[in-house]
Amino acid sequence: MSEAEARPTNFIRQIIDEDLATGKHTTVHTRFPPEPNGYLHIGHAKSICLNFGIAQDYQGQCNLRFDDTNPVKEDIEYVESIKNDVQWLGFHWSGDVCYSSDYFDQLHQYAVELINKGLAYVDELSPDEIREYRGTLKAPGKNSPYRDRSVEENLALFEKMRSGGFEEGKACLRAKIDMASPFIVMRDPVLYRIKFAEHHQTGNKWCIYPMYDFTHCISDALEGITHSLCTLEFQDNRRLYDWVLDNISIPVHPRQYEFSRLNLEYTVMSKRKLNQLVTEKHVEGWDDPRMPTISGLRRRGYTAESIREFCKRIGVTKQDNTIEMASLESCIREDLNENAPRAMAVIDPVKLVIENYPQGESEMVVMPNHPNKPEMGSREVPFSAEIWIDRADFREEANKQYKRLVLGKEVRLRNAYVIKAERVEKDAEGNITTIFCTYDADTLSKDPADGRKVKGVIHWVSAAHALPVEIRLYDRLFSVPNPGAADDFLAVINPESLVIKQGYAEPSLAQAEAGKAYQFEREGYFCLDSRYATATNLVFNRTVGLRDTWAKAGE
């Protein structure tokens, strides 16, 4: 298969192919333009993969540009986080990082040009009055009483805005287009507003700041962007994008193309709702492993490869749809099944004593790090007479479908011996505290000599060598597929989205590195937490289970 045949195909790539074939463009230049007012989420990952992926595949360029036109909501913390996320996903921007604020001088000049052409005016209606005058989808707007000011008056008033002569909300610059337009975005949109706030890039140089719709198209043109890719909610804004560029003296006119945004089940991606989750402490922060943020997914144990594969699988269309969470989980499960080394950890431990094993002694059992990849090597795991097993792996009585340890019956310990449960010890409440067993000494990693069949296999950890670990069982943040549609999305937070257990792990995990994934055999995929784990306090996050338990629960 050729490189071209291996590329994904979608309507945007078809447009690019045609543009290159006809000579409309000789190269491809895209951009990823986030506003630095929050952390990136999985929806942004789709746009990152699209814009940077196209530039990569067509040997073009992709800019990282911060749409930093609202100093009140933006912070350098978000700038650094976004840069880190883009790089972590495996992409590199062309040249230096760009900022819309780099172009504030040019943007101001273009605003003055529109005023000189009679296409912009200073309006002194209040924000509420502007909304009232704008009309509705069913009713046209009406002209502002300030709409017909002279060019000279507008120039003077705009300079007064720039020099701080108006209070916030007392004046703005509006485009003069058509208050009766069927498209509300074209009803004399605001181009500049007043904000007395220090900007993280320009300091206090400006007290007027351009709006997104005015800034975005001009920034694209100044950077020589050939294909400006936006999500579908900006479809109507394309009319304003083109109007601005058509009415200023700028030689380049990029084209905007829209694609569907990513909607994902069992989460929300509204920045307002995500911020509410954080500020009201329903989650631990923007990087909480239950959040759909890239930093949250990374902390949970998702790999950049799995997120890129997910974005590739869902594709790029113009049709809005909601993607099943199982699709994202499947991508990380496949990745980690292929690449994660194996280890043993007991999440809900109960003591098991092998009475006929030499007491006080131990031996090393050799275990493969991956059952299908001998090149990943092996490790030695200590075994002794007292071990921990998972409480769910033992029953006093069970039917034939139960393939684990049952009183009076046998089971194999993973890569070790066959044992038989002989008796149990219980506390005053009737809870099993210890299981007493015997072992067949001639069954270390082999079948019994007499040919008897032992079907079940369970994992274990030597009690004398076990590492105490905190295990955080993360699950979907919401209990319904579309929490955003609920009257109160906070009311459908999944109460089981985080369950914390105290368990034991094999000693090799003392060397675990933050973020490195492991398959805890028979349990799921886990990684060492980057926030809470220390050398003396090991905390592991569940990335995803071995199988989709939500699908089974819904059947």
Swiss-Prot record:
Keyword Transport part of the UniProt annotation: no
Family matches, as CDD domains: GlnRS_core
A GO term, aspect molecular function: ATP binding
Catalytic reaction(s) noted: tRNA(Gln) + L-glutamine + ATP = L-glutaminyl-tRNA(Gln) + AMP + diphosphate
Keyword Flavoprotein part of the UniProt annotation: no
Residues at which L-glutamine binds: D67, Y212
Sequence motif: 'HIGH' region, positions: 34-44
Location of the region described as Interaction with tRNA in the Swiss-Prot/TrEMBL record: 317-324
Keywords associated with the record: Aminoacyl-tRNA synthetase, ATP-binding, Cytoplasm, Ligase, Nucleotide-binding, Protein biosynthesis
Major localization listed first in the record, in broad terms: cytoplasm
Family per record: Belongs to the class-I aminoacyl-tRNA synthetase family.
Subunit structure: Monomer.
Name of the protein described by the UniProt record: Glutamine--tRNA ligase
Source species: Klebsiella pneumoniae subsp. pneumoniae (strain ATCC 700721 / MGH 78578)
Lineage of the organism: Bacteria, Pseudomonadati, Pseudomonadota, Gammaproteobacteria, Enterobacterales
Primary gene name: glnS
